[in-house]
């Protein structure tokens, strides 16, 4: 991306390129020449693509400078020239691929002396690799014209860069047909046989290792292409040649010819191990049931059914069988090695790389489950030799891992593939392992010896981990597996004393070790809540009572909240842009919220919240009871409830809005309206006019009958006055009569027509009646007569004339009836103004006379 979008800074190379006498070394001394080349600087490319400059750069990467030259000539210029030639610029690639003289100059590097400069060889391999990848046709055609190309490659195969060039030639050809042509050409040149000839005691170690690595790469590359299912017109000729028995026999002959050479043996075994690797299936047979299987330390994806059917190279197995005794002899008589002084003591003789690779080869041969090969290994007593090495080299875990794999493969090996008998045939490997190799006895003896050494303060044996896995393999295969019946019978045939020791070992030390190995690395228990923690320090915190109650209330709310709250809360993305249509959508959704109101819930948090609320409510009840006791009989029987025998009706409840309190006071909104009405007197009179005709019927519409007048004494100036109440609130408390009062009922008429809350005059009795609040229930005339019976008949001497509003509060306590309904509350407790005196009749009428609209 840096080069693609031209994010580099401006360079002064353009100014430098304008010089007429500019030389190539002077240009290569610039630090940003490579960056300018990658961004395809036209002036720079024109300068570099000159034939003389291209030949100079090719000479720098192919010709070794004199040792006495400057450091820039020896290292800097060849390195910068190689980077420019391999910068993957199309113009440079085209110039190199089209100029055969430049290719000949490059090819001449292989025709130099016996040894190549490793640094120049890496430059040469890198340039040839970019040409193979970008100019495949031109370069392959050029190389096939050279008869000595394969000879030159094999001559310098000891140089790692040349081995990389051979691998690039095999892997960088993308077109299948051209790649197959390259493989056939190399097979015709007998490159496989000639690489095997390099694995010979007469060659040096570098040639051994590089030739072996090249053969292994050819095997893996060819098999990988088969797995990927790449269609090719012909089978891979190089792989077919490598898997032939004659080719393997040639390799084995070179390994054991003449004096033993560890490098030759190890390099040859690496090729054999690669050939014995199980073949992975083609991509079309791989399913979702694939699982990971470790083969020679590498993870390979194998189908479970194809793993057992995967056969190793039969040519390698047939060629390996006659040489098994030579490999077994290497285990018994290894090449001479000097003793090694280890931290735990002297190791004489060391195991060595040779015997370690031999153990790997024999383990792969046993895992192949070939009947003839297995029989030969049992005759040579190879399993017993492997166990001897296992217990002898205590701290060689490479050896322990290979022997463990070998023993596990032998215990779980099925019948030979070529066995045609329907009846199960005893597996000779399992019998040899338990009876001849005394596997169970060795496991018990080694375990007891380790316990004895550790009890004395000595170190633990290095093979104990692998020994545990071997013992588990015996137990598991005895319970289930292809040889479970045979293995169980062999365990029963052990001596009685050894059988008891084995059973005690399996149920005791082995079970304890397995339990320790399966315990989580972090020994903690997962806590579901803080109350599950057993740490006493976390239970000593004392939280304030308010915090506990607040948390309990929050828990109570969250537990009663259903999932509908989350689903219906907030705005929908689609409706958010539609402001006019969806303005009420959140309110509609909020109306659908449901909460659980189960009264039978026994949640401790809910109980705690209920107790708290009861305590606080009880405090208010106690205060109200004290106030009621202080007033005594200051309230009349009809102040706050229905008279006995009447139906209580809250007349004002249906007419008043939620904001109006029971005492006639309103919320802040109505207070604002009150201020507006005081400023505008006309609006106030209009409101009263709408109420008067319906609330106070005219005398002509009322039937004649006896009446009574209530009069009040003048209130002293120091008497407490009630709270101011708006005129609109007083008028709103007057109810519309539904029917005229009955004949003969006492009538109330207003002594002060200017205010509806003025005290009323009783016409047939002198008992003073307290004005009722708007929230009082309606009563019948009969109830009024029964209540007023026994009261004083003389009228009060109260002045019924119009009084000053500031002092027109009657003395209720002096004229109230001592009879007060039990359980009812006084107006003071409810915050009711005591200046309202509109007594509501059962039918909603007021006993007073009509009030005209102009009387306000």
UniProtKB/Swiss-Prot annotation:
PANTHER family: SERINE_THREONINE-PROTEIN PHOSPHATASE 6 REGULATORY SUBUNIT 1, SIT4 YEAST -ASSOCIATING PROTEIN-RELATED. The modification Phosphothreonine is found at residue 524. GO terms for cellular component: cytosol. Protein phosphatase 6 (PP6) holoenzyme is proposed to be a heterotrimeric complex formed of the catalytic subunit, a SAPS domain-containing subunit (PP6R) and an ankyrin repeat-domain containing regulatory subunit (ARS). Interacts with PPP6C and NFKBIE. Interacts with ANKRD28, ANKRD44 and ANKRD52. The modification Phosphoserine is found at residues 232, 529-531, 633, 636, 698, 739, 826. The keyword Phosphoprotein applies. Ubiquitous with highest expression in lung, spleen and bladder. It comes from Mus musculus (Mouse). Residues 842-856 have a biased composition (Low complexity). One of its GO terms (molecular function) is protein phosphatase binding. Residues 621-770, 792-856 are annotated as: Disordered. Residues 621-630, 667-683 have a biased composition (Acidic residues). Belongs to the SAPS family. It is found in: Cytoplasm. Residues 10-403 are annotated as: Interaction with PPP6C. Residues 644-656, 794-809 have a biased composition (Polar residues). The lineage of its organism: Eukaryota, Metazoa, Chordata, Craniata, Vertebrata. Regulatory subunit of protein phosphatase 6 (PP6). May function as a scaffolding PP6 subunit. Involved in the PP6-mediated dephosphorylation of NFKBIE opposing its degradation in response to TNF-alpha. It comes from the Eukaryota. The keyword Cytoplasm applies. This is Serine/threonine-protein phosphatase 6 regulatory subunit 1.
